[in-house]
């Protein structure tokens, strides 16, 4: 048996490490290879601390060497986990919460909730403590996307007072109106009733320590948006749009709402969802079904950051239906896109907190419009 190190390297170039877009060699995951007779020792470094990722790495390396080099090679895989550094986030905390990010869209149907769910899961994978408040009162979909639709939050006693304890999955703490309503019935509430329910979720819940609380807002601009901004000091807003002109017109209005002088919530950036269609069997083919770079051009026109583009692929829909955010499927184009989005959001939050004062909740009056509190 004559095993060559170069053949082992070539075999490992055909697989990827969990969470990396490049192959295992070019990404730097393979640290060392030792070949002695029929024995091959491979030292690998990964960033994903989960036991599943470590086991998968071992199996993939062995499979690659046995399949491409020699089926009877004695393979030893040493996997070391080095978790990525968590960037320092400086924000104004409210009980335990460092940064509150509102995710909005001027128009329904652009994938705002899907983007929010994957952004939350991506931030959790990066090592942040993340909460997600589903404020889309009339169409709460976050519980289904996290496979917790059948769960019911329990109460927890903190300093002698009872609080709602969020449901947790994939490292994300979740609260939604959907946990407290019948899934087969429509939520028919007037604005004040919906706002009251949200206030209970916000102030009668125990989130613990969080780096980020993401809020999945309803589409458009209205009572719920104002109630949230009255209740909480929003660190910044992320606006989701497709490249389509009709969606961009509504996204422009959404940005304008946050930029109103007496609301003045910093816009962290715009995300272009469904940027292009890519068949999973032809990942290099791009079809711009809804137009090309519309949200990117809108961001430039409005002088706000462009946070990235998310492709339209079948895997995103399937992952949402299965209750497992697609960003958790390491190595796929859509997972890489959401991971890049999370990195850009963190970058934008850090820059915002270094250059702007802490946010304050706003106060709405009937006679004076919106004024800072």
Describe every region a protein language model picked out.
Residues 54, 59, 211-212, 218-318:
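Conserved catalytic-core segment of NTP-binding enzymes
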Residues 1-31, 63:
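N-proximal, solvent-exposed amphipathic alpha-helical segments enriched in charged/polar residues
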Residues 123, 128-184, 202:
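Phosphate-binding loop that captures ATP/GTP phosphates
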Residues 100-136, 263:
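Walker A/P-loop phosphate-binding motif and the immediately C-terminal alpha-helix
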Residues 26-29, 36-38, 43-104, 349, ...:
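Extreme N-terminal, non-catalytic leader segments
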Residues 153-156, 177-192, 201-225:
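Switch II (G3) loop of P-loop NTPases
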Residues 344, 354-373:
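A short, charged, Gly/Pro-tolerant segment at domain boundaries
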Residues 322-332:
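C-terminal boundary of histidine-terminating zinc-finger modules
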